[in-house]
From Swiss-Prot:
Signal peptide: none annotated. Pfam families: RNA_pol_Rpb6. DNA-dependent RNA polymerase (RNAP) catalyzes the transcription of DNA into RNA using the four ribonucleoside triphosphates as substrates. This is DNA-directed RNA polymerase subunit Rpo6. It is found in: Cytoplasm. One of its GO terms (molecular function) is DNA binding. Belongs to the archaeal Rpo6/eukaryotic RPB6 RNA polymerase subunit family. Part of the RNA polymerase complex. Keywords: Cytoplasm, DNA-directed RNA polymerase, Nucleotidyltransferase, Transcription, Transferase. Its EC number is 2.7.7.6. GO terms for biological process: transcription by RNA polymerase I; transcription by RNA polymerase II; tRNA transcription by RNA polymerase III. It comes from Haloarcula marismortui (strain ATCC 43049 / DSM 3752 / JCM 8966 / VKM B-1809) (Halobacterium marismortui). PROSITE patterns: RNA_POL_K_14KD.
Length: 57
């Protein structure tokens, strides 16, 4: 998690990516995990999640 990202934003990213993976999206990293949420967490840690957060202040 970067310094400006809240835990809610992280949770939203991980949940969205896990849903994509559960529906058959390709995995972006090499991993031994088979559960979508664990794969999403590894992708997040590797910095390869295909999401950005646009805040409207």
């Amino acid at each position: 998690m970067n310094a400006q990202e809240s835990r809610y934003e992280k949770a939203r990213k991980l949940g969205a990516r896990a849903l994509q993976l559960a529906h058959g999206a390709p995995v972006l990293i090499e991993t031994e995990h088979t559960q979508p949420i664990l794969i999403a967490a590894e992708e997040y840690d590797a910095g390869v999640l295909p999401f950005t957060v646009n805040r409207s202040d």
